[in-house]
Amino acid sequence: GLVGSEMCIRDRLYTIPNVPYDEVPEGFGAEDNVVEKMGGMETELPKDALPHWELAKKYDLIDFDLGVKITGAGFPVYKGKGARLQRALINFFLDEARASGYDEIMPPTVVNTASGYGTGQLPDKEGQMYHCEVDDLYLIPTAEVPVTNIYRDVILDEKQLPIKNCAYTQCFRREAGSYGKDVRGLNRLHEFSKVELVRIDKPEHSKQSHQEMLNDVEGLLQKLELPYRILRLCGGDMSFTAALCFDFEVYSEAQKRWLEVSSVSNFDTYQTNRLKCRYRNADKKTELCHTLNGSALALPRIVAALLENNQTPEGIRIPKALVPYCGFDMID
């Protein structure tokens, strides 16, 4: 009957990705992304510079084998100054977000199916999420899912906008890539820490919001003194749900490659349409909000870049901004 066909149409609609904005470059993959900006100084490393997985072993910071023993590949154990560096980064990122006007949320790391559909991870990423089938719950791939779903089925008042939230969570992803040099060490994990920024705004303000978020993320990389670049993603490399996306990458001198540390996306009304997240304008009419989010920042590759780019013959130097959070200025 009618309900059956409505559900059938809805299921079809769930498989259609967002429509890219006009300013999205055409292209199929990473090679078609456009470099918008380069920043930070490239570091001069000692001749025998080591990749982070060797530094982690040398200074007893991260144990990948222990993680394999306890869980499996892609679940490292952080130890001593390695663990303290993680915690320092999380607190630094959250404090910086708060200084930029974001309200901190500590959400569940497990969500129901409705939440997965609300932000568009389902059905698109069904096979890439850890699914607890007995309870029909999913481990989150990003804090974007629980935080944005706070506003599911909500009508906001215009003066509540923009909503700016930040959240630190563990994130879980099944698709930790295959084997090879790109997935060694911290490059790709099944479980990792991340601080996420989420914004909900009026449609006419979302472009401005996007720019502010890009500035927030760039500020973090500048304070961490890391060489970085900003990419405008082409249509083929953008996520299923994004209308416009910029990636931040940091340069790993020891690996001689760029590592992605953040994606900052505008979803237009793609998520709010699913979430039924609206606001009441001055004329008392309800309109769909726009959602945006970005990592500020994802930890594993930031740790990798910090270890690799700051190695000296004496040890690993901690950037000035992090010293008060770490309680030490060298790993030796």
Describe the residue ranges of each PLM region.
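Extended amphipathic alpha-helical scaffolds
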Residues: 21-44
